[in-house]
Amino acid sequence: MPLLDSFKVDHTKMPAPAVRLAKVMKTPKGDDISVFDLRFCVPNKDIMSEKGTHTLEHLFAGFMREHLNSNAVEIIDISPMGCRTGFYMSLIGTPDEKSVVKAWENSMQDVLKVKSQEDIPELNIYQCGSCKLHSLDEAKQIAQKVLNSGIGVMNNAELKLENL
């Protein structure tokens, strides 16, 4: 089985919160697809809570689209990592990391402004597969931690695992 790109970087050296351009690929028609690692927690040191991560999944995708989408960039998907240390963001286009950082910061500010559980999008039995697995308070704690820590930019060359 081929080794996935996410397993070719040294997780013991990853800072968090931080952005990493994980890969850029071309579609058959020549469009760029970029995949970003949005690392909220230092791997193997901390994880996001299950309910907080799920609530962030509902909020973060919309807020990031508001702050990052443009004529040159369109977010395809933002999904939580199984290890609960971050999210992967796939998009059409090639925004620079500073633009992604700014959009992430603004999105975390937006999370803090959400007033109640009722304001979480798609939080119902028809649109969510685990609609009781949410916590706005935990999502706000994650957002505040990101903002307090500041978001950095990872360097792929420094994270590359040798001998792969």
From Swiss-Prot:
Pfam families cross-referenced by the UniProt entry: LuxS (PF02664)
Keyword line: Autoinducer synthesis, Iron, Lyase, Metal-binding, Quorum sensing
This enzyme's EC code(s): 4.4.1.21
InterPro entries named among the record's database cross-references: LuxS_sf (IPR037005), Metalloenz_LuxS/M16 (IPR011249), S-ribosylhomocysteinase (IPR003815)
Gene3D superfamilies registered for this protein in UniProt: S-ribosylhomocysteinase (LuxS)
Gene Ontology terms describing biological process: quorum sensing
Note describing how the cofactor binds: Binds 1 Fe cation per subunit.
Quaternary structure note: Homodimer.
Its biological purpose: Involved in the synthesis of autoinducer 2 (AI-2) which is secreted by bacteria and is used to communicate both the cell density and the metabolic potential of the environment. The regulation of gene expression in response to changes in cell density is called quorum sensing. Catalyzes the transformation of S-ribosylhomocysteine (RHC) to homocysteine (HC) and 4,5-dihydroxy-2,3-pentadione (DPD).
HAMAP family per the UniProt record, alphabetical: LuxS
PANTHER family linked to this entry: S-RIBOSYLHOMOCYSTEINE LYASE
Protein name: S-ribosylhomocysteine lyase
